[in-house]
Amino acid sequence: MINNRVVITGIGVVAPNALGAADFEVALKEGRSGIRFFETSQSLNFRCQIAGKPLITEDYKARFFDDYYQNKLDNNAIIYACLAGFEAWENAGLTHHQDQIDFDSGMIIGSGALGLDGSNHAVFSKILAGNNKRLGSRAIPESMSSGAAAYLNKILGLGNRILSNSSACITGTESVLLGYEHLKLGKAKRMLCGSTEGDGIFIWGAFDAMRILTSDSNEDPTNGSRPMCNSSVGFVPGSGSGAMVLETLESAKSRGAKIYAEILGADVNSGGLRDGGSMTAPNSNAVVHCMKNSLREAKVNSDEIDLISGHLTGTKGDATEIKNWKKALGGAQDKFPLINTPKSMIGHCIAGAGSIELVATLIQMEKSFVHGNYNIKEVNPDITAEIPLERIPMKTVHKEINTVIKANFGFGDLNCAIVLRKWKDG
């Protein structure tokens, strides 16, 4: 049976606090926030009037869209995915040709509420105004869940599997898992994997109605997202995209590619909406099962983990997540790995979260640092009852990071975990 080793050779990102991987590195180190106040949310009487949204400049967009005739796109989720995906492809040292198809390469770009983002511009507003005939040919492509992958592939011309997954907040990590499995089986040489999430009142309003967003920081946006903090009252919605080029080790070595990390193992599962699991809450037994299975496949012991990239949204679920990590990893309390999340800077980017956070993880591994968990005034005591305070860095720590486990958990009782090891020629 074919069992290829799989590595990551390219990264790209569009985040609320940075455009591109180089800028994202700086933002992570300095704790730069991309969370802002939105007057539209205030005018609609949203309880949460802040969000993390990428600031795409026309110059930044023009470098990509003017060359590839995508400048008329209205859907932000698609725009973010195209920018992040193309950056990752170039970062991997790969090229594309207008008149050729690359059957050795494929793509998995997941999305969440992509239709709610684009449909506002492309469909709803024109239909309600009686302008159905003016919808144009982009209405459906910009609204369909596979729109991001389709528009990006229009440029790259990849001929292997082209897939768009949608699994709530695990979408990004799951896209990488799916690409990893495809490459392990020898069905492709390269897979561009990632996810994207759009923004705007339709997406934000739906979460606001659930009363799971923060409502105490409309006048202080940058301090609104506070994962693991005792005073946190909900998460801040975010948007953006992360993308990575996954490649078989054989392919990467044959072309002398830079390798960021190797994927050692991964797992995805469901709690079945049983035993405490629901549409909005996880089944802790399933979460622990997922974490353990990813480590088992990776053949990694818990004491080898240097960093946990957690889900940690800034809700009451943070303490439960820490308990689950503790149960899955076992070991002495003082041996618990460092743990962080970039959500204090960018908010919870929903379907885009896993991929953006994986890019953040790869940057930290490459540059040997751990970014801080910013905005914490006092750590939730239910968390410090489980792990030592010093395992939760509040500012950037410069440290060699060799092995990381990254996990996300999503509505519908879904879980996904991935184990990565920094590449050191071997």
Predicted regions and their residues:
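ACP-dependent fatty acid/polyketide chain-elongation machinery
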Residues: 1-70, 250-262, 359-374, 416-426
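Condensing-enzyme catalytic core mediating Claisen C-C bond formation in acyl metabolism
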Residues: 5-9, 26, 32-37, 220-298, ...
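Conserved beta-ketoacyl condensing-enzyme motif
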Residues: 8, 23, 29-166, 196-204, ...
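Active-site pocket-shaping loop/turn-to-helix segments
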Residues: 15-18, 65-86, 134-144, 162-177, ...
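Active-site-proximal alpha-helical scaffold in enzymes
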Residues: 81-94, 145-148, 153-156, 162-196, ...
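Phosphate/pyrophosphate-binding loops at sites that engage ATP/ADP/AMP, CoA/4′-phosphopantetheine
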Residues: 88-103, 252-259, 290-307, 329-333
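Glycine-/small-residue-rich "gating" segment that lines the acyl/pantetheine channel
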Residues: 127-136, 177, 181, 185, ...
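Acyl-CoA/ACP chain-elongation machinery
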Residues: 187-233, 268-281, 310-319, 335-389
